[in-house]
A protein has these predicted regions:
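Long, low-complexity, charged/polar intrinsically disordered regions in eukaryotic proteins
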Residues: 1-18
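Long, charge-rich, low-complexity alpha-helical segments
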Residues: 14, 27-86
Length: 86
């Protein structure tokens, strides 16, 4: 299953973190830690497995730990309307 960014968001990087605003709802969201890298990797729709393959070389972590973090991010972002399934 692939995920894509909600096109109705405005995002900007600030000191390595990501700040986003929902144009539809006027709400703000902040991404820290690994989340900004996941968000950047989602410039094109991707599955969790594709994200793991792309991001694993950037982090000193086991693939299953990264997959768990990515799954949590995708689920949270989807539930908050920041990602959708194309």
């Amino acid at each position: 299953m692939r995920f894509a960014r909600n096109p109705n968001l405005v995002a900007a990087e600030m000191d390595g973190d990501m700040v986003m605003m929902s144009i539809e709802h006027g709400t703000y969201f902040g991404l820290t830690g690994i989340a900004p890298q996941i968000w950047e990797a989602l410039e094109q729709p991707k599955s969790a497995g594709e994200l793991v393959q792309e991001l694993l070389p950037q982090f000193d972590v086991a693939a299953d730990v990264l997959r768990s973090d990515i799954d949590a991010f995708l689920n949270d972002m989807h539930q908050n309307g920041l990602l959708h399934r194309p």
